[in-house]
C-alpha cells in the first residue's frame, strides 16, 4: 500500500501559495485496512477516510465511468488494483493531477508542472466534459490564479462550451452553483469568474438576471447602456471594489445593483424603494439559498439604489426613514456597507448632475449626526408606547435638518 499527497496541496506548494488542506490518495489499500488503522470512514459515494490524528482526508484510488447525467452520474471502482495514474486521469485539470510521494518526488503523468510553469489551466482528458461542475470550477480557478498570469487553454474553453451546449448544466444543484460562486467571490479577482462564464455561454444559464446586462437590446435607454453599463464597465467596477473590500456581501451587492439600470427612464429622483428591482434580487437569493447576511445587503442596496444616489436632494424625513427601513439603529454596519457601495455606483458617471462620489460619505455623516439621539431623555419626559417611536423620529429629523442647514455652504458635506 502506498500513500500520495494529491490535489490542491501539491498545486499550491508548487505555486508557493499557502497550503490550506491536505488530501491523500491510497493506492493498493482497502477499506478494511484503513478501518483497522483507526481511520474514520466519511465518504458516501466513494470511500473517504479521516486520519485518526490529523483528520486529513484519505481516499482510496478510484476509477470512474460515466453512467448517467450530471456530476453525480458516475460508477466508481475502488479496488486495490487501481493505479495512481488511473486515479489522476479522472481529475479535472492537469495542475490538480500531480501527486507527491513520501520522499517528495512528483508523479506527473499529465504535465501539470509544465502547465504551472506556463500559467495554463488545462483539462486532463476528454472525459472533462462528463462533469458539468467543471465549468464552474475552471471559472473559479481562472479567478483564483489570474494574478499569477494563468489563463484557460483554448481547447479547455472549447470543451466548456460543449458542456453548455449539451445542457449538462441543468443537472447542477443550486447549492453546488452557489458554493463555487461564493469561493470565486472570495478571490482577488472575482470579476474573472463571471467573465469566463459569459465567454463559454454559461452565464445566461446560471445567472439569467446578470446576463441581461450584457445585451444592450434589453435596455430602454440603449445610449445609456453603451456609455455606462456594458460588461467591461460592470466587471471593471467589480475588480476595482475587490481591491478595497473583501466582504462577499459587498461584492455580490455591487453586481446586483446593475439590475436597477433598466429603470433609468423612470423619474428615479422620486423613488424611495424600488420594490421591483429588489424582488429580482430576492428571487436570485432564494433560488441559490444565499445566506441572509448577503441577501439583505444586496436587496437593500438594489432597492434603495436611486434614493442613495440622490440622497443630497432627499428630505431629512426620508433619510431618517431610510435608516429605519435598513434597521440601522440595531445594525449600523449596514450603513457602512451601503455607503461604500454608494461611492462605487454607475451613476457616479453623471458628475455634472449628481454628487455621487460623495453620496456614501454624506450617508455616513448623516447617520453619525442622528445615531446618538437619547431614548432615555424621551422616557423621562413621560412618553409611552408608540409615542416613544414618534418622538425619537421627530428628534432625529430635527437634529439632521439643523445640521444640514448649518452646513449648507459646504456643498459636499465633507
Swiss-Prot record:
Q: Which cofactor does it need?
A: Mg(2+)
- Where Mg(2+) binds, per the record, is at 21, 23
| Superkingdom in the source lineage | Bacteria
Catalysed reactions, semicolon-separated: a tRNA precursor + 2 CTP + ATP = a tRNA with a 3' CCA end + 3 diphosphate; a tRNA with a 3' CCA end + 2 CTP + ATP = a tRNA with a 3' CCACCA end + 3 diphosphate
The residues listed in the UniProt record as binding ATP, with positions renumbered to this chain, are: 8, 11, 91, 137, 140
Which Pfam families does this UniProt record tie to the protein? PolyA_pol, PolyA_pol_RNAbd
| InterPro entries recorded | CCA_bact, NT_sf, PolA_pol_head_dom, PolyA_RNA-bd, tRNA_CCA-adding_enzyme
Keyword annotations: ATP-binding, Magnesium, Metal-binding, Nucleotide-binding, Nucleotidyltransferase, RNA repair, RNA-binding, Transferase, tRNA processing
Task: State if Disulfide bond is listed as a keyword.
Answer: no
Q: What molecular function does GO assign, one term?
A: ATP binding
Similarity annotation: Belongs to the tRNA nucleotidyltransferase/poly(A) polymerase family. Bacterial CCA-adding enzyme type 2 subfamily.
Task: Share any extra remarks.
Answer: A single active site specifically recognizes both ATP and CTP and is responsible for their addition.
**What is the official name of this protein in its record?**
CCA-adding enzyme
Q: Organism, per UniProt?
A: Buchnera aphidicola subsp. Acyrthosiphon pisum (strain APS) (Acyrthosiphon pisum symbiotic bacterium)
Classification from the root reads: Bacteria, Pseudomonadati, Pseudomonadota, Gammaproteobacteria, Enterobacterales
Gene that this polypeptide is encoded by:
cca
Amino acid at each position: 500500500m502506498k500513500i500520495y499527497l494529491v490535489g490542491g496541496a501539491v498545486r499550491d506548494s508548487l505555486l508557493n501559495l499557502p497550503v490550506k488542506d491536505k488530501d491523500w490518495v491510497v493506492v493498493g489499500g482497502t477499506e478494511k485496512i484503513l478501518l483497522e488503522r483507526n481511520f474514520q470512514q466519511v465518504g458516501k459515494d466513494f470511500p473517504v477516510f479521516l486520519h485518526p490524528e490529523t483528520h486529513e482526508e484519505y481516499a482510496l484510488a478510484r476509477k470512474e465511468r460515466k453512467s448517467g447525467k450530471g456530476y453525480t452520474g458516475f460508477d466508481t471502482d475502488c479496488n486495490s488494483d487501481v493505479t495512481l495514474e488511473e486515479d489522476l486521469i479522472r481529475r479535472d485539470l492537469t495542475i490538480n493531477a500531480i501527486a507527491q510521494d513520501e520522499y517528495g518526488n512528483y508523479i506527473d503523468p499529465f504535465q501539470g508542472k509544465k502547465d504551472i510553469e506556463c500559467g495554463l489551466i488545462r483539462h486532463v482528458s476528454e472525459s472533462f466534459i462528463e462533469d458539468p461542475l467543471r465549468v464552474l470550477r475552471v471559472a473559479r480557478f481562472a479567478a483564483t490564479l489570474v494574478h499569477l498570469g494563468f489563463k484557460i487553454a483554448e481547447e479547455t474553453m472549447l470543451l466548456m462550451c460543449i458542456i453548455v451546449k449539451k445542457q449538462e448544466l441543468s443537472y447542477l444543484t443550486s447549492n453546488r452553483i452557489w458554493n463555487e460562486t461564493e469561493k470565486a467571490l472570495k478571490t482577488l479577482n472575482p470579476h474573472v469568474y463571471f467573465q469566463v462564464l459569459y465567454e463559454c455561454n454559461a452565464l445566461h444559464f446560471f445567472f439569467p438576471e446578470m446576463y441581461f446586462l450584457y445585451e444592450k437590446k434589453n435596455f430602454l435607454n440603449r445610449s445609456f447602456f453603451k456609455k455606462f453599463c456594458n460588461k467591461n464597465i460592470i466587471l471593471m467596477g467589480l475588480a476595482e471594489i475587490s481591491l478595497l473590500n473583501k466582504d462577499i456581501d459587498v461584492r455580490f451587492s455591487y453586481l446586483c445593483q446593475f439590475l436597477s439600470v433598466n429603470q433609468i427612464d423612470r423619474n428615479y429622483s422620486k423613488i424611495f424603494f424600488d420594490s421591483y428591482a429588489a424582488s429580482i434580487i430576492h428571487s436570485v437569493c432564494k433560488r441559490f439559498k444565499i445566506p441572509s447576511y448577503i441577501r439583505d445587503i444586496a436587496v437593500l442596496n438594489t432597492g434603495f439604489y436611486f434614493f442613495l444616489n440622490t440622497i443630497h436632494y432627499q428630505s431629512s424625513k426620508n433619510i431618517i426613514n431610510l435608516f429605519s427601513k435598513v434597521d440601522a439603529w440595531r445594525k449600523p454596519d449596514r450603513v457602512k456597507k451601503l455607503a461604500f457601495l454608494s461611492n462605487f455606483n454607475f451613476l457616479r458617471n453623471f458628475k455634472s448632475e449628481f454628487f455621487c462620489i460623495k453620496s456614501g460619505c454624506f450617508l455616513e455623516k448623516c447617520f453619525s449626526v442622528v445615531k446618538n439621539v437619547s431614548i432615555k431623555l424621551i422616557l423621562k419626559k413621560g412618553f409611552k408606547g408608540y409615542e416613544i417611536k414618534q418622538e425619537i423620529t421627530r428628534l432625529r429629523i430635527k437634529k439632521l435638518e439643523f445640521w444640514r442647514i448649518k452646513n449648507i455652504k459646504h456643498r459636499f458635506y465633507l
